[in-house]
Amino acid sequence: MTTLEASYARCRELNKAYGTTYYASTFLLPRARRPHVHALYGFCRYADDIVDDLGPVPVAERAAALADFGARFTADLAAGDSDDLVLKAVVDTVLRFDIDVECFDRFLRSMTMDLTVATYETFDDLMLYMDGSAAVIGEMMLPILEPSDLGLARPPARDLGVAFQLTNFLRDVGEDLDRGRVYLPQEDQIGRAHV
């Protein structure tokens, strides 16, 4: 049986190992909030690893693994607990802070897009993807951060998520090309630059 403490520790390890910039930023938060931010990172990392790090596994198998992960998360959430080392902390965080589960659905939809969509024609097309891959992360964070006005905080939280994602796209251009993906919009950016 996985303990809640071990689950939060695993999420923290994932955040520290793979999201060093995001991990460092958690030190700006009150100590009691940090484990919950690590849990959200753990969820996102788990899904991202299914999409990107299964090596030469066929797309259909990765899609099935991602769907299974989503179904397991939904079932664990309904049960109020999980035996999974990462999901146990995620379920606890979602329930403790009443995070909108629809945010996780949108995130998983965007991760599924990564399996089949290799390029984005326009910035508007890319924004549809980033709504679930980035903006939604800001929405997930808000209940943990407890702003005084949730409605007022939502747009900048979404915008910050998108800004982080765009920065990652620029930083990871080579890595994304190796995976057969181009996140820079063809028409809006590359076409104008004649790249």
Where are these regions (language model features)?
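Acidic catalytic motifs of isoprenoid enzymes
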Residues: 1-192
